[in-house]
Swiss-Prot record:
Family: Belongs to the universal ribosomal protein uL2 family.
Coiled-coil portions: none
Subunit structure, as described in the record: Part of the 50S ribosomal subunit. Forms a bridge to the 30S subunit in the 70S ribosome.
A Pfam cross-reference name: Ribosomal_L2
Protein name: Large ribosomal subunit protein uL2
């Protein structure tokens, strides 16, 4: 995928870039694999804001993605189309299985329409195939990695991300995550061969505020621009500093505070933290 630039015939067009959608082969989603996605406006079931600066945006249909892929072991599938998904940065691939079922998966980099994909312990470690980590060779690049066997993919799902298999020890496999963290994952966890496609997504420049609103993002208000009743940084005559360490609206330190729980159960699976610590 390439990034498309525009002539600067307006100020916002000067910086704006978009994705080149030439790699897509189908415009309309598979109706049976979509469902309604109601807007929340960042509110919970009590109507209170739990996630700020969310609201508006273009209406979307949610594409149901198969993140488990276990129940199709031994059933081959053909890649029927590569599609756009407004709910994620990656592209998605429509699979037609030999038993007649259709499913969506994340489209790895280099996957072509017409390719054959397999799932299960007997599958070869080639692009798009999903299999347990115990059968994936050391050095292989994978994505859509499970943390718990059978729970479904949780790691390396966004555009351009991947995980590398570093080594194996008894019932665990050591992998390098996109953050640089080395972590033990159970050998029965499934992963898909290859890196997630649409790697140029990180180079997209929205160019104008309105395009951010189309995505459902509202302006992020600075605390120093608020009143004292609304934020610890608020108030003062004219532009004034916070007068304290930067904090959140609820008083929690905003820079450098470690929020991970001490003695968390999953600490024993982390070999090296991100940053080499």
């Amino acid at each position: 995928m390439a990034v498309k630039k525009y002539r600067p015939y307006t100020p916002s067009r000067r910086q704006m870039t978009t994705a080149d959608f030439s790699g897509l082969t189908k415009k309309r989603p598979e109706k049976a694999l979509t469902e309604a996605l109601p807007k929340t406006g960042g509110r919970n079931n009590r109507g209170r804001i739990t996630s700020r600066f969310i609201g508006g945006g273009h209406k979307r249909l949610y594409r149901i993605i198969d993140f488990k892929r276990r129940d199709k072991s031994g059933v081959s599938a053909r890649v029927a189309a590569i599609e756009y998904d407004p709910n994620r940065s990656a592209r998605i691939a429509l699979l037609h299985f030999a038993d007649g079922e259709k499913r969506y998966i994340l489209a790895p980099e280099g996957l072509q329409v017409g390719a054959t994909i397999n799932t299960g312990p007997e599958a070869e470690p080639k692009l798009g195939n999903a299999l347990p980590l115990r059968f994936i060779p050391v050095g292989a690049v994978v994505h859509a990695l499970e943390l718990v066997p059978g729970k479904g993919a949780q790691l390396a799902r966004s555009a351009g991300t991947s995980v590398q298999v570093q080594g194996k020890e008894s019932e665990y496999v050591i992998v390098r995550l996109p953050s640089g963290e080395l972590r033990r994952i159970h050998t029965e966890c499934y992963a898909t061969i290859g890196a997630v496609g649409n790697a140029e997504h990180k180079n997209i420049n929205l160019g104008k505020a309105g395009r951010s609103r189309w995505l459902g993002r509202k302006p992020h208000q600075r605390g120093s621009a608020m009143n004292p009743v609304d934020h610890p940084h608020g108030g003062g005559e004219g532009r004034t500093g916070a007068g304290r360490q930067p904090v959140s609206p609820w008083g929690q330190l905003a820079k450098g505070l470690k929020t991970r729980r001490k003695r968390k159960n999953s600490d024993r699976f982390i070999v090296t933290r991100r940053g080499g610590k």
